[in-house]
Amino acid sequence: MSPALYSAAKSVLFQMNPETAHKVTLWGLRLAEKMRVLPLVMGEVPSDPVEILGMKFPNRVGLAAGMDKEADTVSAFGQAGFGFVEVGTLTPRPQPGNEKPRLFRLIPQKAIINRMGFNNEGIAAGVENIRSATRFHGVLGVNIGKNKITPNEDAAQDYLTCLRAAWPVADYIAINFSSPNTPGLRDLQAAEPAARLLASLKSEQSNLAAETGRHVPIFMKVAPDVTDEHIAELSRVFLDEGLDGLIATNTTLSRVGVEANPRHEEAGGLSGAPLTERSTEVIGAFASELKGRIPIIGVGGIMNGVDAVAKIKAGASLVQLYTGFVYRGPDLIRECVEAMKAECPVHR
């Protein structure tokens, strides 16, 4: 899709309530995919294949969790040119999320604040949607979380329930324990709770692999609001417990860079351009601690190809888009793939 065409579409979508615009966009993508015109509209994305943890990615640019919460637009996003698609966050039981309004654009700052709260129809419905995506043949990640009503001491059971349900359909499973929009969730990022949770997940991963004959890597998604000491502690946990992969980062509670926008006082996680630098710093800090033993997916404020390259140079193996995709459209996928291919070629 040309930048001019997306700009015209965005001018219409940005007249709508953000959550309505999101739903309309997903509906339009599904319709175009069903009519088999999506590849023509989106244009071709260059090939830049890479293999990580046994998964073969056609390129290194993925869709971050939160865009396709219900996993009902998987095939369309695959045809849009993404090298991989991560759906969710999905929870054991359906839940409505937080009260509306809960999604806000900060247009001058190219940012979004959301306090969605894991609104979804539940893991069973999500898995059924994935099974229906028969025209999707790419790498699929399933992002899972706990229900709001589940106390933290029982959180592991929620994650285990989702792990078991997602196992047959996922290429990798991402543990969301860093969203700022579920009360107390980030407490699980402390070293001891994180170690207990990861140990439970790795034990069940071994059981499921033995039962099914297939290995599904487990990733954990971390917040950007962490100190260097916390990064070092979590890195030791991840290495000791055998984490397969890391996703850095989730949205931030910081409002640095958006103070002038009247929306900056809205509660929730901030994403987009104001997060670019901090997320890259966190990727670099984790990469320094992990020393290449755990691959990193870099996400947070990728608004152009330069940002994507910076994430790779900081230590990420793959990147994901969300807010940049909202503001730039599908052309951003191609730009990032081309930039990384030129500046950070894969050693084959």
Curated annotation (Swiss-Prot):
Binding of FMN, residues: 65-69, 89, 143, 176, 221, 249, 272, 301, 322-323
Keyword Membrane belongs to the record: yes
Top-level taxon of origin: Bacteria
Enzyme Commission identifier(s): 1.3.5.2
Residue ranges that the Swiss-Prot or TrEMBL entry lists as coiled coil: none
Entry membrane topology: Peripheral membrane protein
Keywords from the UniProt entry: Cell membrane, Flavoprotein, FMN, Membrane, Oxidoreductase, Pyrimidine biosynthesis
Cofactor(s), by name: FMN
Active-site annotation: 179 (nucleophile)
Keyword Nucleus attached: no
Cofactor, free-text remark: Binds 1 FMN per subunit.
Catalytic reaction(s) noted: (S)-dihydroorotate + a quinone = orotate + a quinol
Residues that bind substrate: 69, 114-118, 176, 181, 250-251
Cell compartment(s), UniProt: Cell membrane
One biological process term in Gene Ontology: 'de novo' pyrimidine nucleobase biosynthetic process
PROSITE patterns named in the record: DHODEHASE_1, DHODEHASE_2
Family in the record: Belongs to the dihydroorotate dehydrogenase family. Type 2 subfamily.
NCBIfam families cross-referenced by the UniProt entry: PRK05286.1-1, PRK05286.1-2, PRK05286.1-4, PRK05286.2-5, pyrD_sub2
Protein name: Dihydroorotate dehydrogenase (quinone)
